[in-house]
């Protein structure tokens, strides 16, 4: 999911 990818930045 795109959201999960974004969370990876954190």
Curated annotation (Swiss-Prot):
It is found in: Secreted. Its main location: secreted. Belongs to the tachykinin family. This is Tachykinin-like peptide-VII. The modification Phenylalanine amide is found at residue 10. The modification Pyrrolidone carboxylic acid is found at residue 1. Expressed by the venom gland. One of its GO terms (cellular component) is extracellular region. It comes from the Eukaryota. Keywords: Amidation, Pyrrolidone carboxylic acid, Secreted.
């Amino acid at each position: 999911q795109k959201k999960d990818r974004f969370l990876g930045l954190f």
